[in-house]
Design a protein with these regions (language model features):
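Boundary/linker segments flanking structured domains
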Residues: 1-51, 59-65, 76-218
Length: 221
């Protein structure tokens, strides 16, 4: 049976696409969603200078993640000042911050490394982290890191951003495939969009026999 989850959201400037802080009931971690143009305004929030990890993202036309960068911060939103000067791609920052007891240096280092590895595995978007952290996650810390990442993944999903591996979410019920006319393709429909999966193939040397395409071709002669 699925477990219900309660979230509290504050829209700090009264706009649905403005600065938001999100807290899951009984969690020690707070999420801050910060549009880049509002970075200076976000610095005025209480608790936003705590340690944690963050995502810098840009979106495509469908409001899905197109590019992503993941980092750690020991002083909260102040870390974004460097990225505001040096990284041009991002439009929004999403920060996951907590107190020092929850997010020790080892914890945020392990969480950063884990999140970057998951982003590469997801194959959903371009990951801007050119160097993977060499931090080795202690086996005793891993269960807590996985638990925190699961919460991060859930919060991101509530904001419309899927972090999970695309192929791991597929099953026979929602996967479609075709092998006709030189095409070997697999895809999935999520209720809104149809996405062709990586590895699909099409033989471009085969002639198109579509009646519709032939009519279109004749109409432009």
């Amino acid at each position: 049976m699925a477990i219900s989850k309660k979230l509290e959201i504050i829209y700090h400037n009264g706009q649905p696409d403005g600065i938001r802080s999100i807290r899951r009931h009984l969690s020690t971690m707070t999420t801050y969603v910060i549009p880049r143009p509002l970075l200076s305004e976000a610095k005025k929030l209480s608790g936003i200078n705590r340690p944690g990890i963050y995502y810098l993202i840009s979106e495509d036309e469908d409001n899905k993640i197109a590019q992503i960068y993941i980092g750690q911060t020991r002083n909260g939103v102040v870390r974004l000042d460097d990225h505001n000067r040096t990284k041009g791609f991002w439009k929004k920052a999403i920060m996951f911050l907590a107190d020092n007891k929850t997010f020790s240096l080892d914890m945020i280092s392990g969480l950063e490394a884990y999140a970057i590895a998951k982003a590469h595995d997801a194959k959903r978007y371009k990951v801007e982290n050119s160097v993977n952290p060499k931090y080795e996650i202690d086996e005793y810390d891993l269960p807590l890191i996985e638990e925190v990442y699961e919460e991060i993944q859930f919060i991101m999903a509530t904001q419309g951003y899927k972090l999970d591996n695309l192929k791991s979410t597929l099953n026979e019920a929602n996967t479609l495939h075709t092998t006709r006319n030189g095409i070997l393709a697999f895809g999935v429909y999520d209720g809104e969009h149809f996405e062709v999966l990586e590895g699909s193939e099409i033989d471009m040397s085969r002639k198109c026999h579509s009646v519709t395409m032939e009519k279109i071709g004749r109409a432009h002669v």
